[in-house]
Amino acid sequence: MIRTINAGLNWLILLTPRWLPVFVLIPVLYLIGWSKAQLLTLVGLPTSAVSLVGTVFSFLLFLLLMPRWIRLRWLIKRPWVALGLRGMEAHQPSSFAVLLRGLLWSVLLLALIVLPLLLGHWAQFQRTDSVRLLLDAFVLLFGIGLAEEILFRGWLWQELNSLLGAKAGVISQAAIFSLVHARFNMGVWPMLGLLSGLFLLGLVLALRRRLDHGSLWGCVGLHGGLISGWFLLEKNALQLSADAPAWLIGPGGSNPNPMGGLVAIGALTLLLWIQRTAFNKSLFTKTEHRNAS
């Protein structure tokens, strides 16, 4: 039985053409996870929770499969290093330091949205202490933030680099990231704004990983910090006015996404330029050291 399962997994991973397993993997895992969640309804799982539980099952299966996938397809013996969850070199900053740096960038980006809201009297501070909200924010940070970064900047980006090349790979992962998170039930211009902001965020996160020497934790801090930070602000710390401008808080009506606002788009564009300048400078420094030695 185990030998049959192993053979089936190897067959899936090594399917040809080479791009086919990439497009087949997630639907197959989601179908398996959804099926397992459906079975739990027989023992009392609410039908409203099937999608969430199925997604959790699917991601756990994804993590279990990754070591085999990386060894067979990427020919790398250290899967968690390849995904960016463990450092490649001893002299690199700790994962906690890299995570903290990403969190600080998320705080700065959110501040660029919150300060104009307060100064323009489109929002005011409120405080409703809630342990449940803090726990939810923690889950968003280390649940959604970590899971999505493993999926997009850990696994998908590497696969797209292998299939399309480095330049097309980084653009493609950002495009897929934006499309997956877009809402298509809004007008054309709000949707384009949201797609643009999410695309820029995908590029920023990819370059963040490059600057962090392959570590994924800076991406987790930045991405998860934006999600959990905006959640706490919107649900707990800020009372938004009904006339708060969409160019500031983003499209979405009563459930806005600030990444689609002009302020976030401008800030992400600036951050992308800063990161790219820093990355080019680090490459130049490495080249000089190599030539000197």
Locate each region found by the language model.
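Alpha-helical transmembrane segments in multi-pass membrane proteins
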Residues: L15-L75, F96-G102, L135-D136, P256-G266
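Membrane-interface helix/loop boundary segments of multi-pass membrane proteins
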Residues: A147-S172, L207-S215
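Aromatic-anchored segments of alpha-helical transmembrane domains
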Residues: I26-W34, L110-P116, A174-R183, G224-N236
